[in-house]
Each structure stands twice: as structure tokens, then as C-alpha cells.
Amino acid sequence: DTQAMKALILNSQGKTEEAFDLAKLALKNAMKSNVCWHVYGLLYRSVKNYDEAIKAYKFALRLDPDSRQIQRDLSLLQAQTRDWKGLVDSRRTMLTASSGVRANWTAMAIAHHMAGDYQAAEKVLNLYEETLKVPPPSTDLEHHEAVLYKNTIIAESGDYERALQGLKALYKSNPDRTAVMELRAEYLLKLDRKEEAEKAYRNLLERNSERRDYYDGLEKTLGLDKNDPASHAQLQELYKSFADKSERIDAPRRVPLDFLQGDAFREAADAYLTRVFRKGVPSTFANLKALYNDESKKQTIEQLVLGYASQDNNEENGKNWNLAVNYFLAQHYDYYLCRDLEKASEYIQKTISLNPSRQDYTFHLTKARITKHSGDLDAAAKQMNEAREMDLADRYINTKCAKYQLRNNQNDTAIETMGLFTRKEATGGPLGDLLDMQCMWYLFEDGEAYKRQKKLGLALKRFKSIHDIFDVWYEDQFDFHSFSLRKGMIRAYVDMIRWEDHLRQHPFYSRAAYSAIDIYVKLFDDPSTANGDLSDADKKKAEKKARKEKEKAEADKKAAAAAKATATSEDVVKKEDTDPQGEELLKTKDPLAEAMKYLSPLLEHSPLNIKSQQAGFEVFVRREKYLPALKCLVAASKIDSNDATVKEQTARLRKTRKLTIVPSSHSRHLTDNIQTVSGLKEPLPEKIKEVIDAELATLP
């Protein structure tokens, strides 16, 4: 046991290998010690090997079935790994041992709920309520949350009538009044009690007249459909009744523009535009650009605003009128659906001349965006920097400027710009602080800039940082398995669990993964790309920069060592970055195996994204795994059979009966998907040929 405890201490000091060796020795000396097995599980948990940790915990429980600590640690890991059936058993044991703790009852209900047993979850919560001899006080938020959680379980089981009856007692007592009202309206609508549902949604709109979900619910209760022209007159009258209640409300004036057509749309758009232009609302175009998918609406808006621009301003329109109209037209002609950059530049220059403020950078920002769309990234970055200098205390324009600098491949300048708003004392400088803040947009843009410059090591470093951030998000939920139960925030905890299950559907993960996969495919096709494509001058510059960063890294290392020597038990010493340039990432002997680390989550969580399937094809076909490649190709074809990349990949796979892929020094981006081929070293097995032929016959 002493050896096991020493192993635990060594692990906390970062000596993981030594800790495991000592823990194994402890097990060898005392195989039947529950402490040794528990510590062994804790070591595996610290290295994120949850499966082995669970095995160790279970073995420890066999030796000491009454250990609450081991049982608790096991239950937390079962929640982390989504072993809901195992969690039910663990929570039942814990509840039996400590039935007086409310958190144990709640945890048991959650386990049943997540396992899909709604009836058992409700029963557990009811049993606890029956054990209460004194009703909880009105200030007991944990009780109110548990009761509302029980109501949502009943609703999820499909028994909306009983859930609705339960809400009646909650309305006056539950502090989350809005949630109760929303659930009541939802239940009434599902039960087809439309008159009561209409009243419920109108009450919600009295509380928040800008919430579009409430308007959608109200439309359903009235049997109105935006896609049905016969309903448009009634819908227009409905929204007018809400708009007339207050001049400040925007939603009932904006929503009708989505479904109105023809003259009715022109009249409503005219009224809406006149109202917002008189106020000088800068976000008007952002609020209306969704309408541009309808060609007739786009033309109507253009005609109306051009008409405003041609008229002389009057006192009724106010002093902001000309400024707002010209700014709208600048954004209008910059938008990709009606792009005319010459006109956009003309209107933005006129807008800037009308703007008396020397600190309002809004119009200068749009000018830089127009320049960017013209293709002059260097001028756009300079213009955005000029906009930044108009208000040096504004973080948003500072961030925007850094993004434009990255688009212009000015990585060093961009990090200096970002450094104006990062902590000066942060380890690793501005980049280290951005990593701590998990600033994914910067890491992605920085990686893309390095990728364009053929600095693939640094690019991979940035994309891997994003990959690691999602790992951190996944690991962070571990603490909430116990924290949320202690605090009684049950519904938020369940929402978090469901959100974590789809974590890697996040667009930032997908974008970083596609770029990383593309680089690894290039490394497989042509390993010499790891050396980059730099001129002698660029190489000297890179070497000089590397030396400076190495010196800085050594200084940081010494500082970290000094901090470690004087650190207390509460101090956290950051891990040293041994590969700041990403050189080790480029030296991988199996690029496709590294690509699979990014690809597997994509195929699991974003299978409906055609880029995921196309990336999967490129990786699998190079690994000569033709059936998985075929599966990706079929999935991509179902998403969009007319996609050019799908057709090219289909043609390539049809040649696999006679040809195989070999490395090419001219591999292009994944979106090009063009690869050279030569004769097969070995013929494909007959069964694989048959499957490929059968599936390919169904593809265009």
C-alpha cells in the first residue's frame, strides 16, 4: 500500500512512467490489496485510459465492495464513457449505502434517464419526494430544479398530458418562471389544445416580443403556415398587431419580410427600411441579407434603397438618413449575390465622407472588406490596420485586423497585433495566452497562413492545437459529473452531456481536420514536401527566426524550472513545448495513421458533410483499404451525386481492378483529388472486386 501511495505522489510530480512501474510492483507484492488496484486505476485515469481505469476500479471493488470512494470514482468514469447501464448499477449501490443524500437520488434518476428508462427515472425522483417529512422551503433551488427535471422526463417519455398537469403546481412556486411557461406552451401545442396554446404563447410574447420561437409557436396554434400564400394576409395582420404595441420592437416588423411577396413585400420592406434608416441602424444589411436568396426580393430592396439615395434628404428622415442609405448600398454591392466592387467602393467612400466621427471605424472596416474581396489582401490589411488605429481600445477591430493580416500571410505582424490585448506575463508570449484562452479562430487562420507559405510543420502545430482543445473540452466534463449533482443544476448537466456527445461536429474542428488531413496526404504522396518550398532567403530568415525562438524557449525552460523548484502544492506548472516548430509532426513515419486521428471523429460525427466523406476516400484509398473508401464514396454520392470531386473519385476507384495509387510529387489539394496511378502489385481479391463492381454500378 505504501508503494502504491508513493506511485500516486510520483504521478502528481509528472513522473508517470516511474509511477506505473512502482504501482505494478505494488500489485505484484499485494495482488489482493484494494488500495493498490484503486491507485492503479487512478494512474490510468490520469493518462485518460478510461477503459483500463474502469477495469482496475472494478477489481478493487471485488476486494472491497463497501468502499464508497472507489464506487464514486467508478461511477464518474462510467458517466464519462457513457456506460449508462453500468452507471445504473453503481448508483444503485451508492444510493443503498447513503439514501439520505439527495444527490445520490438525483444521480440515480439521471442514470436511468440517460439509459432510456424514463419510468424508472421518474420513480426514483418520486420515491425521494415521498421520503421528505417536511416540504422543502421556497428557497430550495435544488428541489425546484429536480421537480422541473422530473417534469421534462415525463414529457420525453411521451406523456404530455401528465407533464402538463404537473406544471400547474410549479407555476407559482418555481423560480424559473420562463422555463415553466415555455414548457406549458410546448405541451399544449403537442396535445393539440390550440386555444390554450395560443394564450400561452401570447403570454410569452408579452414577456419577450423579440423571441422568434414564440412567434413560430403562435403561428402553429393559429393553423397558419408561412409557405401557404392563403395564410399570408392573416399572418401580416397578426404581426402588425404586435408591431403596433411598441415602436421599439423589431421582430414583428422583420419576420413578415420572410414570407410576403410582390407588392405586399415592397410595401413592408419600404416601411421597414425607412424606419431603420431614420434611426441609422448599422446592422440593417446583416439583418436583411438572408432575403437575398430570393431574386425578386433582392431586386426590390435594391430598387427601394437606390430610390432613397436619389432623393434629397428632408428633416423628417433625420441626420442619419444619407449615412445609413449609402452604407447599406456599399454592403449591398459587396455581397456575393450582387457583387459590384466598383459601386461598393464608390458608396463606401461617400459614406466615409459623410461620417463626422474620427473614432467610428465601422465604415473603414467595410472599406477594407471590399478591398479584400477585390483580391488585394495587402491593401486590405493596411486599411484594416488604419481602422484599428482609430480606436486602439477596441478589442473587436483589433481582432479583425489580425485576421486580415493572417489572410495576407503576415503571421509575425498578426501576433504582435493580438499581443496588444493579451496578458504580458503569459508564458509563451501572446501565442501562449491565445492557446490558454482556446482562441480557435486565430489558431486556424494562423495554420492556414503557414500552410499557404509551405511551412507545414507550423501549420500542423496549429491544427493539432485545435484538435487538442476539443480533447480538453471532452475531458473538462469529467469534473461536472460530480459538481453538477452537488449544485443541483440537473437540466443544464443533461444538456451538457448531450452537447458533448456531438462535440466534434463543431465547424472549427472540421475545418482544422480537413486541412491537417490534406497535409498528411501530401506528406504521404511526397515526403519531400516536409522540407517546404522556400527560397534561400526565406530559409535563412526561417533559420534566424528558429534560433530566436529556440533561445526564447530555453529562457522559458529555465524560468519554468525555477518556478517548478519553488512551486507549492497549489501551483500549476505548464508542460514544456518540446516541438515549437512542429518539426516532429512532419517527421512521422506513417502520415496516414496521423490523418486517421482527425478523420475518425469526422466520419463519426459529421458523416453528412461531403468533405468528410471525400477526405475519408483519399485516406482509405492510399491505405489500400478499398471497401472503406467505397463506403465513403457511396455516402458522398448520396449527399451530392453531381459533385465534381465525387465523379473524379468514382472514376479513380473504377480503375482499382487494374490500377493502384502510387506516390506523386505533384499531389494537389484534397478538393482537386487528382492522383497518378500505375499497375497493381497484387490483384484485388475476387470478393472485394464483386462488392466494388456492384456498388460502382449504382454510382453515376
Sequence positions of predicted segments:
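Non-TPR docking regions that flank or precede TPR/alpha-solenoid scaffolds in eukaryotic proteins
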Residues: 1-700
